[in-house]
Structures are given as structure tokens and as C-alpha cells.
Amino acid sequence: MKKKKEYRIAVLPGDGIGPEVMQEAYKILNVINKKFDFNIYTNEYDIGGIAIDKYGAPLPKKTLNGCIESHAILFGSIGGKEWTHLPADEQPERGGLLPLRKFFNLFVNLRPIKLHFSLKKLSPLKKEIIQDGFDILCVRELIGGIYFGLPKGKNTFDKKNISAFDTEIYSTKEIEKIADIAFQLSLKRKKKVFSIDKANVLESSMLWREVVIQVSKRYPNVELIHLYIDNAAMQLIKNPNQFDVILCSNLFGDILSDECAALTGSLGMLPSASLNESFFGLFEPAGGSAPDLKGKNIANPIAQILSLALLFKYSLQLEKISHLIELSVLKTLEKGYRTLDISNGKKYITTDQMGNYIAKTLSELIN
């Protein structure tokens, strides 16, 4: 008898609403395990604030080792006011998530941002701007740039005039790697790459533009458009439908991907993937830990479920299953089911009810 293929997923629910929305992702995994001829094994590990409380560190060795032994990481959310008193490097994000990204060399962050037809009323943009919807993929460099550049610190010699500094630094190879990913992904889309920089002012952006132009020559069928960061922020508001793949440095990508997300009306709908060159990845909702929603059974689990869909697509290379999960979400929304954040003041369902409906729809689609 042929042995079933096995996949191992490290599950890191984290803090805030993370554990609640993760329960809904488990429902999807249960359906998939029953319906397909392979086995998905999950192991849960602590990270962030809960790990600080249990082990005194935001990224325990047990958690890191569990991730190393897995094919992918399904991540919830971390952080909360309980841990803001700690030194910056010991807080949940800087001490937990950032080192995890660095350890696995997760240099590319993908954030697909779509405006669902059934949710157009939630967008803050005028209906004439979003009448055609939009489908944007933000490709952000994740482990370089100003967040990691050295030196950084404070000058405290003059107590009356303290200064602080950070360093924005990128190498040719770093830019080439992320640009190559953006162009490859554009080939399966509308074949447009919008490269974002500030090349009229910043040396790092000047190099960014030079390298991206060189990479673009390997993709003659892809149109390359350069935009300054300030103009890009404006164009996203005026005409989001013009965009396809947006290629950004770490800082600019952090800003623009959140702006794109806001245009949909709810962060609770948006997944993200952080990948390395072998497509091992960490998959997480784009929103935060939302501690004010914790334990109320009202958080939107769709971003967590769609993050699982991205995990199947990129790390497990099972695009059919990824598509089925996305289709299950879409069909559930088309039936009119809404959590509080996307209810627009009308009747809404709970976190676990939304998970149940999506899992039921997935099961029906597979049958």
C-alpha cells in the first residue's frame, strides 16, 4: 500500500485574537485532511507575549526548533499593551516575529489585496473609483532596509537635545532577489510591475531604481513603471485599478501595503505570505492582534483562513487546494454572511460561525 504524503505545519497562534481565528483555520485543515489523499500534521508552539509569560522570551528555542522541522509556519498575531514596558528587543514583535523572519531568510512579503464585489460598499473610496474593483499584489522586501540597517541608535551626550538615527541600506543582490520575484509573479497576472522609490532624493533609492531596470531587461514582456513613494500613495487613492504588482523596499512596502489594505474596508480580510528562496514561508493575517476583540467571538477569521490558502499555494505547492479555499470564502460572502467588521451596521455572525460556513462550503465544493 502506497504511503500517504505527509506535510507538517508549525502553528503559532500567538496573542490577542490569534488563538480564536486560528481555530477556524483548523476547521479548514480538518476538511482537507478528510477529503484528500495526504496527511497534514500540525504542532502548536508559543510565540510573542504568551511565550514571554511562559518562558521569559518571545521566541523560545522549542518554537524555533518546531518551525525548523516543519514545511511551513501558520502564524496568528502577536503583541499587546501588557508587554510594551519591556525593552524594545524583548517585546513580542521585535523579539519574536522579526528574528523568525531573519532566521529563515524570509526576504519577500506578499500581500494580495482584492476588493470583493460583494464588499464594495465597505471601501472608503467613491464608487466611481472602485466600480471596476482592484486586484493588487504588494511585493515587499522584508529583511533589509532601514529596519535592519546598521548603525542605529541614540546620541544622548546632550540631554537637552537627544538625537536618534537609523540606516537605510540595500545591496545590489538584495534588490535583484526581490525584483526577480516581482517580475516572475507579474507574468501570471497583468504583466505590470510598479517599482516604488524616492530616487530623486535617496541614494538607496537611486541604486534600487538602477538594479530594477537591469532586472527588467530579463522580462521583456513585463511593463515596468517607476513611481516615487509620495506619488504612489496618491495614485492608490485616485485610481487603484491601474496597479498590478507593486515592488517596494521594506519601509515603503510597510506603508503602502497597509494603505492598500485600508482601501478594501477591513484588515480582517487580508492574508500575507513571507517567503525565502525555497518558498518555505510564514503565513499570517495582515491585521494585528486586536486585543480589544479578544474573547468576544466577533473577530473576522477570513484573513487567517486565506493565509492558510497562501500556505498551500506557495510552501506546499498545492494550488488546487489554495483555489478551493479562496473560492469557499468568496461563495460564503456571496451568500451574505458577514462578521462585525464587514457587516456595515447590519446583521452579523460570530467568528466560529463564519469558520463553520466556510468549512461547510469547502466540503461541498470538494464533493
UniProtKB/Swiss-Prot annotation:
User: What is one GO biological process annotated to this record?
Assistant: L-leucine biosynthetic process
Alphabetical list of NCBIfam families matching this protein: leuB
Q: Can the keyword Oxidoreductase be found in this entry's annotation? A: yes
Q: Which cofactors are required for activity? A: Mg(2+); Mn(2+)
What pathway does the annotation place this protein in?
Amino-acid biosynthesis; L-leucine biosynthesis; L-leucine from 3-methyl-2-oxobutanoate: step 3/4
Which residues are listed for Mg(2+) binding in this entry? D230, D254, D258
Function text: Catalyzes the oxidation of 3-carboxy-2-hydroxy-4-methylpentanoate (3-isopropylmalate) to 3-carboxy-4-methyl-2-oxopentanoate. The product decarboxylates to 4-methyl-2 oxopentanoate.
Q: Name one GO cellular component term.
A: cytosol
Detail the disulphide connectivity of this chain as listed in its UniProt entry. none
Q: What is its EC number?
A: 1.1.1.85
Where is it located? Cytoplasm
Q: What class of enzyme is it?
A: oxidoreductase
The protein's annotated catalytic reaction(s) are:
(2R,3S)-3-isopropylmalate + NAD(+) = 4-methyl-2-oxopentanoate + CO2 + NADH
- Which Pfam family is one of this chain's hits? Iso_dh
Please report the organism this UniProt entry assigns to the protein: Buchnera aphidicola subsp. Cinara cedri (strain Cc)
Q: How is the cofactor bound?
A: Binds 1 Mg(2+) or Mn(2+) ion per subunit.
The name this protein goes by in its record = 3-isopropylmalate dehydrogenase
Q: Which UniProt keywords apply?
A: Amino-acid biosynthesis, Branched-chain amino acid biosynthesis, Cytoplasm, Leucine biosynthesis, Magnesium, Manganese, Metal-binding, NAD, Oxidoreductase, Plasmid
Which coarse location class describes where this protein primarily resides? cytoplasm
Q: Which residues bind substrate?
A: R101, R111, R140, D230
- List of residues binding NAD(+): 80-93, 288-300
Q: How does it assemble?
A: Homodimer.
What GO molecular function terms would the record report? 3-isopropylmalate dehydrogenase activity; magnesium ion binding; NAD binding
Which family, according to the similarity comment? Answer: Belongs to the isocitrate and isopropylmalate dehydrogenases family. LeuB type 1 subfamily.
Show the PROSITE patterns listed in the entry: IDH_IMDH (PS00470)
Annotated site, Important for catalysis, chain positions = Y147, K198
